[in-house]
């Protein structure tokens, strides 16, 4: 797919590591969630940012405003509906509007989920305070005759097969995958391990590229509630130590 974007001089940043222009970090406090939202704005002078959260049905939940030069805010969701894996993959939507003299000049929306997780050596993976055994697959973004250029149709077919197996977690080996598939992981409640293409042996000349790709992977995907781990350790069998 190809997307052509036309923007005003003041707009949400398109060059911040390929990220969507807004970062959402929900933190659970009892039954409530505090949503730390940050928008990245190019040419912010004279602009404000409006943050609006809606539920799955599109009903308003909470909102806030911030100066575009430092577009950060904390928004509280009372009695937050948790994103709880395949059992209940509930998603909220944050819509962020850039206003200049009261006029909307840019707008983006991103979905997110309210959840907490932990990994315990005795209890295993814990989601929202409850043991959540992981049973999953490793997935490559690849098809005969298509290669890496999958469409939404093939991504959905892959996800349907994974769900049919009864899996609830996916390792996305071992490069950035399509946002279409990350969205499907959010919607279906998959727990995701994401990776960059760092394979087999360390190349000293590739250190800067490794750090750049990991930064991009995190920034581009941090809003996805499905992602719980990012990795650069594919087939690390030939060396005993690595320092980045």
Where are these regions (language model features)?
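Secreted/periplasmic carbohydrate-active enzymes, especially glycoside hydrolases
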Residues: 1-184, 189-192, 213, 228-229, ...
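Catalytic-core segments of hydrolase enzymes
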Residues: 222-232
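Aromatic/hydrophobic pocket-lining residues that form π-stacking "cages" and hydrophobic walls in ligand
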Residues: 181, 217, 233
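An active-site-proximal structural segment forming one wall of the substrate-binding cleft
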Residues: 210-224
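Active-site-adjacent "subsite" loops/lids of carbohydrate-active enzymes
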Residues: 202-212
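Short, acidic/turn-prone active-site loops that include or flank metal/cofactor-
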Residues: 196-201
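Conserved small/polar residues in nucleotide/adenosyl-binding loops
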Residues: 233-240
